[in-house]
Curated annotation (Swiss-Prot):
Name listed for the protein in its UniProt record: Caskin-1
CDD domains referenced in this protein's UniProt entry, alphabetically: SAM_caskin1_2_repeat1, SAM_caskin1_2_repeat2, SH3_Caskin1
Species the sequence originates in: Mus musculus
A Pfam match: Ank_4
Taxonomy, superkingdom: Eukaryota
Designated gene of the protein: Caskin1
Length: 1431
């Protein structure tokens, strides 16, 4: 590199030594000798045109600059952009470098290629000293750059106050502030004021105004007001308006600032700006008729005859406050002057209508005698009111002006009206001038009359009368508001309410946000007022029918004054008004917040009424109830119906978080409830639901039901349809589905959150159900609380209220309703630990069942095992969970059998939840399962047949279920009926959530599960009906589903709002967490369950059958949830329906749709599960969702081969049929499982082995898995567990669970096997074939000895470790071996059948039935033993 380049680099690096060396003159002698007399080029420029001096100036290094200048570097050398060292020194902003360069003679006014002189750069960057130095060196501040900006423009644009002051104090100030000739046409034309206004620099605007700049100076874009309004600079707009800028100026596009705001902005700031501009455009201006000067009053305004005074407001003593703008100086003089001093002039067409109305209010009310001044003055104060556009609304008198308010142009009319009134009463000097406009005033006037009285709008009562009536009504309402505020010593806010157009009825619907908007900014006062608002008992003041026309409607709500405004703006038809929005109201000039709110409330009510009408014809269970819901929606509910109200007082129907359910949901909830509990609803009808409710109800009924059921479960119970809806619901309705408080979008997110909250004691926990008005409304579904108390599982503390357990007899539920519930279940299974899980009572479903407060019907899909609330539940029911909710995860193709009513034989609990199509359970994508915070799982999942999403890897989940299964036999077994479903469910959820440690078979997780099962299981366990008792177990409707839900929950760890894993329950005794709830609900939800499927292992365990189901889905569900779940037989399911296919719809895990729903031999009640996996070998209860065959086939020996890992890795292959899973058949060796240590079980296997008796698809156990108990105290992995069984289990699990391959199958222990059973169609994918439905497919895995042993004491509880279980163990092992062989045979059969493809359910039922019967005998033995042990 040459010396020049070296010099540039040295200067750039500020290497003074090198620079000096390079610049040093060579010694003459040496130079000659060396021949290097060549002098270094100091002005060498690099590729960018930078010389060494450029770099030195940019760096601000004075030493280098001096060195270079001494070396005769060119001072004004330009770089590629035309920039000189002086430019860079000015830009860098340091005085010393500048001095050096200026002293060297650098030119100050030579521009760069962009037209910038150094002063531009110094001003733009706010370098005061440098700018001052440049001015002292004669820099020209009037030079413009290529964009037409002077240094002052740049300083104003970038907010450089000091530089602006400096420039304005220069001798060039006047020239800088003078408009340039081409400003109005030049697209680049601008001014310092425009730039400062555009960027919100208030201090600079003040400086410019003080310097005398023309405030109304225009460019092509208009005045500075246009710029500030367009850019949302509220304070600038206020300052400019206060400074007297003309708000009526139009730009070259003929737009006023208000037009621009309406057209281009939608922000909150724009609302304020609109209000300010409306007020300004309607500002009253008067011409002074004589001179006035009062030197003794410093606040007085000295005026001369002819001065134009802008009236700002009226002083209490009658004087007016005015502003006189001095165009010469640009200053404004503000002060008070006698109202008799001026005559009103209609200078601005839009003269501030908003404010005007207020004057009319005063003047009109005063009568002709009122001086015009009063009218004008009032107007201004009400400028804010104008915003609401209902100043007139507030006071009848005002209304006259109010109309004009709406349309800026109306201002003139308004003014005329006021003037005319004035002239009539006491003519002021200004009256006469105003009279001419009177014609227009007449129009304005006509508006008011109608407005106030609701008179025909065509008629126009005399203005006086009109004003008087308006002011009278306004006065009355204002007085009422004042008195109300006085009752709690906050009357100081009366002006805030009245000026914003609020009357008591509208106040009753105010929210904290509304209070803040009108100026109640102190939290303490706001809270007090909110509390008082909630105490207001104002009857519904909204029209209960759709009026004939807009005029009538407006008069009914007391806003007749807006008739003309609305008609002028295209809302002449009563049907059009329902489409109006807040923004529309602002735009057309209805700016008073109170009037806006009243209008929007009325609009919503109107929309509801219309929807109600439509719904009458549309049909739809929800819709038909619409009318009632409407009635139910009473404003009665806490007065504030808006979001704030919702916040303040959660409506009866609230999400778990207290957030209100969206109007639709509430409506839907109430509607369904109505069906079942019309009477109840009617009682609640006293709260007239808003029409909104009905309309939404119809659309959202399905979802709402889901939500409601979850709420009910929580204990929120659907508030009476009418009860809670009231205020918040209205608001919600207004907002759409938004939760009560958050107006609009909050709702969905809230739901998600609420789901999370559910895990924590949700607000619902409080007996919100008992809302004042809603209490009576509870529909049967609300009863849920009753079951809740007793059921240990009932959402425990946090969810205490949620009665997920209570399940109405599905039979009672009308089929139509029931279907909804299953879907509703999906609501929040994914929500981790979401209490919603308990959507059991679908309100819609409740209808028929509404047997009093009987347990709310559980959504068909929800396996709400009502754990008998230990004792609370009706006797019998609790235990009858057998049928309770067994839902088969029907193959997707299979119609959801939500409707499948459990045969009456099923018993009260046999609410056969409709089977959720596998696709549903599976459907929830793994992602979903992560946390599907479906707001309440609103989305009713379509029953698609798609393969279930891969189950998340949740070995712990599997383990959890296994643990559950293993959980002490005593608990589970002892109370198998109860515990089985309930405890299992609970445990499942507990375990699933907590144990989801991720190690499929981690000993700890297994131990934890066992412990949980042993600890909580017993208490929780629902007592299993005596073995002989065919009462079907309410297996979770779809173990798979529940499992999926659980898994998903697990996956999420049911993370609570605070981030903790809510799902985990340390002990079964612990309150069921949201997870559990989710599981419960999950069973109902197909999609979400698929997520849980990921957790498939746990789930699978939970419902061994789930796998079985999955695989056996096509084939009989016979696949017992074998390993773990023999405990609780799905026989509930079987009894549920003969026609129900044994589709083990893995519902959640595997959800293979291939198997057409196999007809469950449901009719024949499966004998009590012989093997209860509690402590012992887990014979998976065959998920045969219904276990048609009495024999609950013990799961076939778990396929030993497929290592869980492999399977896990295998993507869930859709198994077309249960057979699809061809995983290795579990060897008969399941016995070994007992002996094998859990550790062998591959994480997952243990769970698998433990598989909690997976209730049938709907078995509660599955749910328990969801609950994923936290790894309570990790118990040592049960030593005895045969690896094979584990594998087999794993295979089964994986097959059932894998239906939706989890992204990390590995997590799923054996479930990992996941044979792609998840995808119903693919069969071959996984090596292990889950036992086909017919196959008991459950390996009897050894249960963790410890938990099983400890818990299971007693006869041959198959608790491997259980000391009491030795003989039992042997028997179990023997039976297991036999079963394994039988199962293998069955599997072969099923495989063949599956290969053949789904067959008619009847055929499947037959084949399944025969297989089940074959294996049944074996299981009967096991079941007998287990029953004996349990008892």
């Amino acid at each position: 590199m040459g010396k020049e380049q070296e010099l540039v680099q040295a200067v750039k690096a500020e290497d003074v030594g090198t620079a000096q060396r390079l610049l040093q003159r060579p010694r003459p002698g040496k130079a000659k000798l060396l021949g290097s007399t060549k002098k270094i080029n100091v002005n060498f420029q690099d590729p960018d045109g930078f010389s060494a001096l450029h770099h030195a100036a940019l760096n601000g290094n004075t030493e280098l600059i001096s060195l270079l200048l001494e070396a005769q570097a060119a001072v004004d050398i330009k770089d590629n952009k035309g920039m000189r060292p002086l430019h860079y020194a000015a830009w860098q902003g340091r005085k010393e470098p500048m001095k050096l360069v200026l002293k060297a003679g650098s030119a100050v006014n030579v521009p760069s290629d962009e037209g910038h002189i150094p002063l531009h750069l110094a001003a733009q960057h706010g370098h005061y000293d440098v700018s001052e130095m440049l001015l002292q060196h004669q820099s020209n501040p009037c030079m413009v750059d290529n964009s037409g900006k002077t240094p002052l423009d740049l300083a104003c644009e970038f907010g450089r106050v000091g530089v602006v002051q400096l420039l304005l104090s220069s001798n060039m100030c006047a020239a800088l502030l003078e408009p340039r000739p081409g400003d109005t046409t030049d697209p680049n034309g601008t001014s310092p004021l425009h730039l400062a206004a555009k960027n919100g620099h208030i201090d600079i605007i003040r400086l410019l105004l003080q310097a005398g700049i023309d405030i109304n100076r225009q460019t092509k874009s208009g005045t500075a007001l246009h710029e500030a309004a367009l850019c949302g600079k509220t304070e600038v707009v206020r300052l400019l308006l206060d400074s007297g800028i003309n708000a009526q100026v139009r730009n070259t596009y003929s737009q006023t600032a208000l037009d621009i705001v309406h057209q281009f902005t939608t922000s909150q700031a724009s609302k304020e700006i609109k209000q300010l501009l409306r007020e300004a455009s309607a500002a009253l201006q008067v011409r002074a008729t004589k001179d006035y000067c009062n030197n003794y009053d410093l606040t007085s305004l000295n005026v001369k005859a002819g001065d134009i005074i802008t009236v700002l407001e009226q002083h209490p003593d009658g004087r007016w406050k005015g502003c006189i703008h001095d165009n010469r100086t640009g200053n404004d003089r503000v002060g008070y002057f006698p109202s008799s001093l001026g005559e009103a002039i209609v200078k601005r067409a839009g003269s501030r209508t908003g404010s005007e109305p207020s004057p009319p209010q005063g003047g009109g009310s005063l009568g002709p005698s009122a001086p015009p001044e009063e009218i004008w003055v009032l107007r201004k104060p009400f400028a804010g009111g104008d915003r609401s556009g209902s100043l007139s609304n507030v006071a009848g008198g005002r209304s006259t002006g109010g109309h004009a308010l709406h349309a800026g142009s109306e201002g003139v009319k308004l003014l005329a009206t006021v003037l005319s009134q004035k002239s009539v009463s006491e003519s002021s000097p200004g009256d006469s001038p105003v009279k001419p406009p009177e014609g227009s005033s007449g129009a304005a006037r006509s508006q008011p009359p109608a407005a106030h009285a609701g008179q025909v709008y065509g008629e126009q009562p005399p203005k006086k009368l009109e004003s008087a009536s308006a002011s009278a009504s306004e006065g009355k309402s204002a007085e009422a508001v004042s008195q109300w505020l006085a009752t709690f010593q906050l009357q100081l806010y009366a002006p805030n309410f009245t000026s914003a157009g609020y009357d008591l009825p509208t106040i009753s619907r105010m929210t904290p946000e509304d209070l803040t908007a009108i100026g109640v900014t102190k939290p303490g006062h706001r809270k007090k007022i909110t509390a008082e608002i909630s105490g207001l008992n104002i009857p519904d003041w909204l029209p209960e029918h759709k009026p004939a026309n807009l005029a009538v409607w407006l008069s009914m709500i007391g806003l007749a004054q807006y008739y003309k405004v609305l008609v002028d703006n295209g809302y002449e038809n009563i049907d059009f008004i329902t489409d109006i929005t807040w923004e529309d109201l602002q735009e057309i000039g209805i700016t008073k917040l109170g009037h806006q709110k009243k209008l929007m409330l009325a609009v919503r009510k109107l929309a509801e009424l219309q929807k109600a009408e439509y719904s009458k014809y549309e049909g739809g269970p929800l819709r038909r109830k619409t009318p009632q819901s409407l009635e139910m929606m009473a404003i009665e509910s806490p007065p504030p119906s808006e979001p704030a109200a919702a916040e303040c007082q959660s409506p009866k129907m609230t999400t778990f978080q207290d957030s209100e359910l969206s109007g639709e949901l509430q409506a839907a909830l109430s509607g369904p409830a109505e069906a079942g509990a019309a009477a109840v609803e009617k009682s609640s009808n006293h709260l007239p639901p808003t029409p909104r409710t009905t309309s939404r109800e119809s659309s959202l009924s399905g979802r709402a039901r889901h939500i409601s059921s979850s709420q009910e479960l929580l204990g929120d119970g659907p508030p009476g349809p009418g009860s809670p809806m009231s205020r918040s619901q209205e608001y919600l309705l207004d907002e759409g589905m938004a939760p009560g408080t958050p107006p609009k979008e909050v709702r969905s997110s809230r739901h998600g959150h609420s789901v999370k909250r559910a895990s924590v004691p949700p607000v619902p926990g409080k007996p919100r159900q008992v809302l004042p008005s809603g209490a009576s409304h509870f529909t049967p579904p609300q009863t849920p609380t009753k079951a809740q108390p007793g059921s240990p599982q009932a959402l425990g503390g946090p969810h205490g209220p949620a009665t997920a357990k209570v399940k109405p007899t599905p039979q009672l539920l009308p089929p139509t309703d029931r279907p909804m519930s299953p879907r509703s279940l999906p609501q929040s299974p994914t929500h981790r630990g979401f209490a919603y899980v308990l959507p059991q009572p679908v309100e819609g479903e409740v209808g028929p069942p509404a047997p009093g407060p009987a347990p709310p019907p559980v959504p068909a899909a929800v396996p709400t095992l009502c754990l008998p609330p230990e004792t609370d539940v009706e006797p019998g029911r609790p235990k009858k969970r057998a049928h309770s909710l067994n839902r088969y995860a029907a193959s997707d193709s299979e119609p959801e059998r939500d409707e499948l009513l459990v045969p009456a034989a099923a018993g009260p609990y046999a609410t056969v939840q409709r089977r959720v199509g596998r696709s549903h359970s599976v459907r929830a994508p793994a992602g979903t399962d992560k946390n599907v915070n479906r707001s309440q799982s609103f989305a009713v999942r379509p029953r698609k047949k798609g393969p279930p999403p891969p189950p998340p890897k949740r070995s712990s989940s599997a383990m959890a279920s296994a643990n559950l299964a293993d959980e002490p036999a005593p608990d589970v077994e002892a109370e198998d009926g109860r515990l089985g479903v309930r405890a299992q469910r609970r445990r499942a959820s507990d375990l699933a959530g907590s144990v989801d440690t991720g190690s499929a078979g981690s000993v700890k997780s297994i131990a934890a599960m066992l412990e949980l099962s042993s600890i909580g299981g017993g208490g929780r366990a629902i007592r299993r009906p005596p073995e002989g008792h065919p009462t079907p177990r309410p297996a979770s409707p779809e173990p798979g589903r529940v499992a999926t839900v659980l898994a998903s929950v697990k996956h999420k760890e049911a993370i609570g709002p605070d981030g903790e894993v809510v799902n985990r329950r340390r002990t079964l005794s612990g309150p069921v967490t949201g997870l559990l709830a989710t599981a419960r609900r999950g069973s109902g939800e197909p999609a979400e369950q698929s997520h849980f499927m990921e957790d498939g292992t746990a789930r699978q365990r939970l419902r061994g059958p789930a796998k079985g189901e999955a695989s056996a889905e096509g084939p009989p569900l016979a696949r017992v949830e074998a390993s773990a779940t023999l405990k609780r037989r799905i026989r509930a399911k079987q009894s549920q329906q003969e026609n129900v296919k044994f589709i083990l719809t893995e519902s959640d895990t595997v959800k293979r749709r291939p198997k057409a729903k196999e007809p469950d031999t449901g009719p024949e009640p499966p004998p009590p599960l012989s093997v209860y996996q509690n402590g012992t070998a887990t014979v998976r209860r065959r998920p045969t969702s219904e276990q048609a065959g009495p024999p609950e086939l013990p799961p076939p020996p778990p396929p030993a081969e497929p290592p869980p890992a492999d399977l896990m890795q295998l993507p869930p292959l859709p198994l077309p049929d249960g057979n699809a899973r061809k995983p290795v058949k579990p060897p008969v060796s399941p016995k070994p499982i007992l002996s094998q240590p859990v550790s062998k079980i591959q994480g997952s296997p243990t769970p698998a082995s433990k598989k909690v008796p997976l209730p049938g698809p709907g078995s509660p156990e599955v749910k328990r898995a969801h609950g994923t108990p936290p790894p309570v105290s990790p118990k040592p992995p049960p030593p005895p567990t045969a690896p094979k069984p584990a594998k087999a289990l794993a295979g089964l699990q994986s097959s059932s669970a894998t239906p939706s391959p989890v992204p990390s199958p590995a997590r799923q222990p054996p479930a990992a096997l996941i044979k792609p059973a998840s995808s119903p169609p693919s069969q071959s994918a996984s090596p292990v074939k889950p036992p086909s439905p017919g196959t008991p497919a459950l390996h009897v895995p050894a249960k963790p000895p410890r938990a099983a042993a400890s818990v299971v004491s007693g006869p041959p509880v198959a608790s491997d470790c259980a000391s009491p279980g030795d003989s039992a163990r042997q028997k179990l092992e023997e039976t297991s071996a036999c079963l394994a062989a039988a199962l293998q045979a069955v599997e072969e059969k099923i495989r063949q059948e599956d290969g053949q493809g789904p067959r008619p359910s009847s055929i499947e039922e037959k084949s399944t039935g025969s297989i089940l019967e074959d294996i049944g005998s074996m299981f009967d033995d096991l079941a007998d033993q287990l029953d004996a042990m349990l008892e």
